[in-house]
Amino acid sequence: MHKKTDFIGIDAPHRPDTFYGLAKCFAEDLGSMYWDKRGMESVCMRILSCAQVTNTRALGTWLSYDDLIQLVERAIDTPVTGFSVVYGVSNNDRAPVDHAKASFLGYRPTDNAAQFA
C-alpha cells in the first residue's frame, strides 16, 4: 500500500488495499492484455474522488464534474489511445498524483479544490 504522503506517478506498481482496489487493478491489467493480444484500445481512468470536498484529503484528490466530463469526452474523441492509464483529478494544488499523462488526450483540467480550503 502506498503511504498517504507519497506522490504517486502513473507508472507506480499496483498496491491495492481493498478488494475494490484489487478489482480496479484487474480491470487495468485486462485492458493491457486486450491491447497486447487484440489491439483493442482503452483508457483506464483512475478517479480518486468526485464527490463534494468535505475533508483535507479531498483537496488533492477531487475531480470536478466539469473536468470529469471533459476527461471522458477527450478519451472518447481521441483517435488513437492504445492502452492508456490516466489519473482523473482536477488541477488541484495538492494533487498527490501526476495527471500530466492525460494531456495527450487534450485533457486540460480547469477546476481546483483550493476554492474549498
Regions found by a protein language model. Name each.
Residues D17-G21, V53-L63:
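Glycine-rich "substrate-gating" loop/helix at the edge of Rossmann-like oxidoreductase active sites
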Residues M1-R38:
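Catalytic helix-loop patch of NAD(P)-dependent Rossmann-fold dehydrogenases
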